[in-house]
From Swiss-Prot:
A Pfam family that the UniProt record links to this protein: CCDC74_C
Protein name per Swiss-Prot or TrEMBL: Coiled-coil domain-containing protein 74B
Record field: compositional bias (Polar residues): 34-44, 165-182
Superkingdom field: Eukaryota
Length: 380
């Protein structure tokens, strides 16, 4: 009974223990189940990040490639437009050259698309607009006291300057459009500096050209009277253009902008007659120079010949005056006489001739002798 009671007494405390053990084991199982899952989550986080980064990189690469393709398309389009503009400029230049200075000023419709402002006499003007000379003269006419005389003077000045202004605008358009086709638009200050630097050599050339042509015409005797008249007219026109440009610079009164003077070929196109005259002048000057050179050569040769003749004549006198005395051979010793025998007793030997045949034969003989010596030594 006691054993049963003990057993019965022992059962109730044992009953709560397994329940408590079970309750304690449940959270432990959950903790155990969570512990192995934590490294899996840690491993999944960098994988997701890598995937996200790869996706973002692919997206950026696609955007970059699309932008590059668009930029290349724009570059090709701009190149085509540039070619078209150059073609139009060339065609406009050819049409302007065909028209010449006889036509009116350049209209805005005929001006090229890439034309820019042009600096003429220190003033920026549109290529198709009125010239600065006309603007200044229009303002000066209102202030002139003499009514009809002033208008006539202004009209004559306009007639003289209109071809020069039209040619200057066309030439500056062609030069600047070609040079600045692939560049940005420069500032007007840089143009002013370049114009002020280029004015000095242009002025010197313009002042020297008429003087040189006049001097050549005076010197050359074979030039015809018509050529002289045409050249004189061209020089007078150049002088008149110079005077008009200086008068314009004084009227402007702007010391910061020096007057700009164009060379004669740009103001007035050369004709075939003028080219022929220049060629004749150059040919005649060449002939004169060759004649002068020949004359100078003859003078130099004539001045050198009389000096050479007395020198040649003086040589025999010196030879006659400088005769060496004969030395007697009696006082000399016999040994010296034996060492220097007379020319007749000397034996003249023939010159040695070395031919390839002789050399080959000598080599063969030497080889045979060497072989005989070796055989003799080997036998002994």
């Amino acid at each position: 009974m006691s054993g049963a009671g003990v057993a019965a007494g022992t059962r109730p405390p044992s009953s709560p223990t397994p329940g408590s053990r079970r309750r304690r084991q449940r959270p432990s199982v959950g903790v155990q189940s969570l512990r192995p899952q934590s490294p899996q989550l840690r491993q999944s986080d960098p994988q997701k990040r890598n995937l996200d980064l790869e996706k973002s990189l692919q997206f950026l690469q696609q955007q970059h490639s699309e932008m590059l393709a668009k930029l290349h398309e724009e570059i090709e389009h701009l190149k085509r437009e540039n070619k078209d503009l150059r073609y139009k400029l060339i065609m406009n230049q050819t049409s302007q050259k065909k028209d010449g200075p006889s036509g009116n000023h350049l209209s805005r419709a005929s001006a090229p698309l890439g034309a820019r402002w042009v600096c003429i006499n220190g003033v920026w003007v549109e290529p198709g607009g009125p010239s600065p000379a006309r603007l200044k003269e229009g303002s000066s006419r209102t202030h002139r006291p003499g009514g009809k005389h002033g208008r006539l003077a202004g009209g004559s000045a306009d007639t003289v300057r209109s071809p020069a202004d039209s040619l200057s605008t066309s030439s500056f358009q062609s030069v600047k459009s070609i040079s600045n086709s692939g560049k940005a638009r420069p500032q007007p200050g840089s143009f002013n500096k370049q114009d002020s630097k280029a004015d000095v050599p242009q002025k010197a050339d313009l002042e020297e050209e008429p003087l040189l042509h006049n001097s050549k015409l005076d010197k050359v005797p074979g030039v015809q009277g018509q050529a002289r008249k045409e050249k004189a007219e061209a020089s007078n026109a150049g002088a008149a253009c110079m005077g008009n440009s200086q008068h314009q610079g004084r009227q402007m009164g702007a010391a910061a902008h020096p007057p700009m003077i164009l060379p004669l070929p740009l103001r007035k196109p050369t004709t075939l007659r003028q080219c022929e005259v220049l060629i004749r002048e150059l040919w005649n000057t060449n002939l004169l120079q060759t004649q002068e050179l020949q004359h100078l050569k003859s003078l130099l040769e004539g001045s050198q010949r009389p000096q050479a003749v007395p020198e040649e004549a003086s040589f025999p006198r010196d030879q006659e005056a400088t005769h060496f005395p004969k030395v007697s051979t009696k006082s000399l010793s016999k040994k010296c006489l034996l060492l220097s025998p007379p020319v007749a007793e000397r034996a003249i030997l023939p010159a040695l001739k070395q031919t390839p045949k002789n050399n080959f034969a000598e080599r063969q003989k030497r080889l045979q002798a060497m072989q005989k010596r070796r055989l003799h030594r080997s036998v002994l």
